[in-house]
Amino acid sequence: MSKKVTETVEQLVTPILNEMGLELVDIEYVKEGKNWFLRVFIDSDDGVDIEQCGVVSEKLSEKLDEVDPIPHNYFLEVSSPGAERPLKNEKDFVKAIGKHVYIKTYEPIAGEKQFEGELTAFDGTTVTLSVKDRGRQKTVAIPYEKVASARLAVIFF
């Protein structure tokens, strides 16, 4: 049911976001404890503010009431993806070039399955990172199809 709910919500929210010049980053429909949460993450090139999240929440709530795809009570949350935004598609990887990222792979690449470093290039088939290895910078090329998950990473100095 979770996949069907997220697909329905995506169909409902996309026109709202397009009208406002925003983009859909992700949708989560999860149970935490006794409560269900429908989380919609939105963004734009300029970021999003609380007013935009509120408008999307109100408009989406109206659509959800009409279609009623969820048979029980739930909490609707609309927010930005935050500082550690997930990279979900090719467009996200292109936008993240020059930024610090964290990537997990399905299988080992050069003996590792987790990488953190600067995303230096993405050509649609290969993600190229500059990572520190024992105090030295090295380049790692990760086949895009081997990426299990990726997100922006915050660097603490």
UniProtKB/Swiss-Prot annotation:
Per UniProt, which keywords does this protein have? Cytoplasm, Ribosome biogenesis
Annotated Gene3D superfamilies: Ribosome maturation factor RimP, C-terminal domain (2.30.30.180), RimP-like superfamily, N-terminal (3.30.300.70)
Q: Which GO terms describe its cellular component?
A: cytosol
Q: Which GO terms describe its biological process?
A: ribosomal small subunit assembly; translation
Tell me the CDD domains matching this sequence. Answer: YlxS_C
Decide whether keyword Cytoplasm is in the record. Answer: yes
Q: Does the keyword Glycoprotein apply?
A: no
Report the subcellular localization.
Cytoplasm
Q: What is its main location?
A: cytoplasm
User: What disulfide bonds does the UniProt entry report for this chain?
Assistant: none
Q: Which InterPro entries match?
A: Ribosome_maturation_RimP (IPR003728), RimP_C (IPR028998), RimP_C_sf (IPR036847), RimP_N (IPR028989), RimP_N_sf (IPR035956)
Function of the molecule: Required for maturation of 30S ribosomal subunits.
Q: What PANTHER family is this protein classified in?
A: RIBOSOME MATURATION FACTOR RIMP
Q: Which family does it belong to?
A: Belongs to the RimP family.
NCBIfam families in the record: PRK00092.1-2 (NF000928)
Q: What is this protein called?
A: Ribosome maturation factor RimP
Give the gene symbol. rimP
